């Protein structure tokens, strides 16, 4: 498996656990390299339009980020870093949903990420949890709490009748991977 300085990742069946111990130069460069594609999706990032270039994308990110409470900011950073880590370290997955909510300058509702598995051509619905060490808990206990929360959130979303979560997920994936017909077929089927 590839490595990224400052990032430790543990992959298990059905989930992955990531710890970022150092915001290294290598991680910073990966952030810069992937920023527009992560935020806007593959198609828009390659369009050449000024609004999808690096500097306007940084400004758009900060506009969304700076007005949020600390807990939401941590969640946004966790989701954003998940995009980077998946793009850099997991060869068998590609992110199929952009980070930015296209309808409003807020966080996305519903599923955090959609991943496309290049090995089995399936779409994975992904929930990201991030945070700091919980009071009175060690790293393992905090990780277990975050994983349990992610599992319960996914279970709830997958079993609720909120059609908007599914429509948003399909729309985001469709936009992000519009140039790859086989991806779109998987998502829409």
In which residue ranges do the predicted regions lie?
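Interdomain/boundary linker segments immediately adjacent to catalytic/signaling cores
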Residues: 1-76, 80
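Charged, terminal alpha-helix-loop-beta segments
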Residues: 16, 72, 89-93, 149
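Amphipathic alpha-helical segments that form well-ordered structural scaffolds
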Residues: 80-89
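Conserved catalytic cores of phosphodiester-cleaving nucleases, focusing on short active-site segments
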Residues: 86, 113-115, 123-130
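A short acidic/basic microdomain associated with nuclease active sites
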Residues: 89-106
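Short beta-strand or tight-loop elements
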Residues: 109-111
């Amino acid at each position: 498996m590839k490595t990224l300085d400052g990032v430790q990742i543990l992959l298990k069946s059905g989930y992955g656990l990531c710890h970022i111990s150092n915001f290294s130069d290598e991680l910073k460069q990966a952030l810069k390299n992937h920023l527009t594609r992560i935020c806007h999706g593959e198609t828009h990032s390659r369009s050449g339009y000024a609004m999808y270039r690096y500097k306007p994308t940084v400004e758009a990110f900060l506009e969304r980020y700076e007005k949020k409470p600390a807990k939401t900011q941590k969640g946004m950073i966790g989701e954003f870093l998940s995009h980077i880590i998946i793009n850099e370290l997991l060869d068998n997955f590609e992110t199929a949903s952009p980070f930015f909510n296209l309808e409003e300058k807020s966080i996305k509702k519903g599923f955090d990420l959609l991943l496309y598995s290049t090995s089995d051509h399936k779409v994975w619905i992904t929930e990201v949890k991030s945070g700091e060490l919980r009071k009175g808990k060690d790293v393992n206990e905090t990780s277990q709490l975050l994983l349990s929360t992610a599992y319960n959130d996914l279970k709830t979303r997958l079993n609720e009748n909120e059609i908007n979560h599914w429509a948003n997920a399909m729309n985001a994936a469709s936009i992000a991977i519009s140039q790859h017909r086989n991806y779109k077929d998987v998502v829409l089927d």
